[in-house]
Curated annotation (Swiss-Prot):
The record's note on its domains: The Q motif is unique to and characteristic of the DEAD box family of RNA helicases and controls ATP binding and hydrolysis.
Domain Helicase ATP-binding: residue ranges: 177-347
Protein name, entry field: DEAD-box ATP-dependent RNA helicase 57
Binding residues annotated for ATP, in chain numbering: A190, P191, T192, G193, S194, G195, K196, T197
Gene3D superfamilies to which the protein is assigned, alphabetical: P-loop containing nucleotide triphosphate hydrolases
Motif DEAD box boundaries: 294-297
Catalytic activity: ATP + H2O = ADP + phosphate + H(+)
Coiled coil: 101-129
Amino acid sequence: MEKAKLSSALFAGTHFDRKRFAGDFARFRQGPPAPDVASAAAPSPEKKRKRQSKAKAKKSKKRRAEGADSASDAVEGFSVFKGLAAKKDEDDSEKKVETGKSEDSEVVRRRKEVEREIERAAILRKKFDIHISGQNVPAPLENFEELVSRYGCDSYLVGNLSKLGFQEPTPIQRQAIPILLSGRECFACAPTGSGKTLAFLFPILMKIKPGSKEGVKAVILCPTRELAAQTTRECKKLAKGRKFYIKLMTKDLSKSGNFKDMHCDILISTPLRLDHAVQKRDLDLSRVEYLVLDESDKLFELGFVEVIDSVVKACSNPSIIRSLFSATLPDSIETLARTIMHDAVRVIVGRKNSASSLIKQKLIFAGTEKGKLLALRQSFAESLNPPVLIFVQSKERAKELYKELAFDDVRADVIHADLDEEQRQDAVDNLRAGKTWVLIATEVIARGMDFKGVNCVINYDFPESASAYIHRIGRSGRAGRSGEAITFFTEEDKPFLRNIANVLISSGCEVPSWIKALPKLKRKKHRVNRDPISTLPDED
C-alpha cells in the first residue's frame, strides 16, 4: 500500500502512453504477470500442435458442412460443379433462343403459305371471272382431282364425272362446290348452261350417307316438273355405283305415298307437290341436311313465296345448309332469300344477270304479227339448223303457231300447260332423240331444261322481262358450246327494247345506237295484247 502511494507521488502529473508501453505498464497491475510480446508471438511447440489439430478439425467440419449443403443443393436441381452448371445454363439459354427462332420461322412460313394460297385463289377467280362476296371463302378448285386430295372424295364419284364427259370444272363448279363442302350457305348466279346442277349435286352426294333409314337428307326444289325430272336423271347418273335412294315427287306420290316407310336420301320436287306432302301427308323433313332452291328467282316470285316459306320451316334441322342457284339474281330476290340464310357467300360468274357470251344474239324487226310469221318461214328456208326452240307468250299462241308450221312440212311439236305430264315428257324426249326438229314452248320449259345440242332459240314473242330473256336463250350455248338466239320485235315491243338491249351489251353483242338511246323503263315486266298468229280460217 505504501509502495502504491509512493508510486503515485513520484509519477503524479506524468502521462504514460499505454499503447506504447503496454508491456511495462502491465507489470504494475495486480494479478498474474502477462506474457510479453515475444512470448505471445512465439508460442510453444505444444500449443502449436494443439492449434493445428483444432484448425484441421474445423476445416474437416467445414468441408462436411459444404458437402451437405451441396448435396441439398443438388436435390433442388443445382449442380455441385459451378463451371458445368454455368455451361448447362448457357446451353439451355441457347436452346431456348433456337426454339424461339424456329417457332418464329414456323409462324412466318405458315403466314407466307396462307398468303400464297390467297394469291392463287385470287388468280383463279380472275382467270374464270368469278366474283365472291363473303368472309373466309374457300379457294376455288383447280381440277376435279382436288376433290380427292382436299376433301377426301370417293373415287367412284370422280370416275362417274369422267364417264359422263366432265373433264374440267366450270367456273361455278370451281367455287360453289368448295363452299358447300365447307359447310357454308351460298347464292350462286351463273349463265345458263354453266353446270349449276352438278355444282349442288356433287357436294350432296359427297356428304350424305347412302341407304340411310333416318329419313330425307336432301331436298331439291325446282320450279317445273320437267326440270325436276331432269335433275333426278342427272342425280342418278352421278350416284351410279352407290345405293342412294333418289326420289322424284310425282303427283301420285304426293297424294298417296307412304312417307313413314319410304326410304329416301334425296327428294326432288316442285314446291306445291312438296308442300302438299308436308301439310296433308305428314312428310317429315326435320332431318334434312341440304336444301337447294334451283332457279331460285322463279321460285320466289309472287305465288311461291308462301309455299317456299312453308317448306323452309318444315326443314327444321338447325345445321341445315341452304343454297340458291339461278341464271339471274335480282336484288329483291336476294334480299328476300337472305332472310332464310345465315352467313351466306354470294358467287357470281361473269356479270350479274347476263347471258352467256357463247350465244350469238340478234334482234330482228318484224313490224307486225304477220311479219313475224314471214320472218320465221324465211329463217327456216335459209338455214334451218335443228334442233330449234321457239318461245311464245301463251299456250293459245303455241297451238296457233304449231298449226301454221304443220302446213309447212316442218317436223314440229308443242309443249304447254294443257298437256298432261306424259305428253309433255314425250315432246321433250322426241326433241332430244331428233324425231322432231322444232319444239314450240311457253315459259314452262325455259327454266333449267337442258337439251343436248340445241343450236338456235327463237323468241317469236318478245320476252316479258330481261330475266325471262336470259332463261329463254340459255337453252342454247350450253356446256361450252356456241349457240344462236333470234328475237323478233314489233312496234308494240319497241318501248321495252332497252331492257333486253342491256343484256346484249353486257354479253358483248352489238346493239344499234337508236336502241341504246331509248329511255329506260321502271317496269320490269310487260305483256302485250297481240293479234292472233293463225292465218288459217276458223274451224266450224
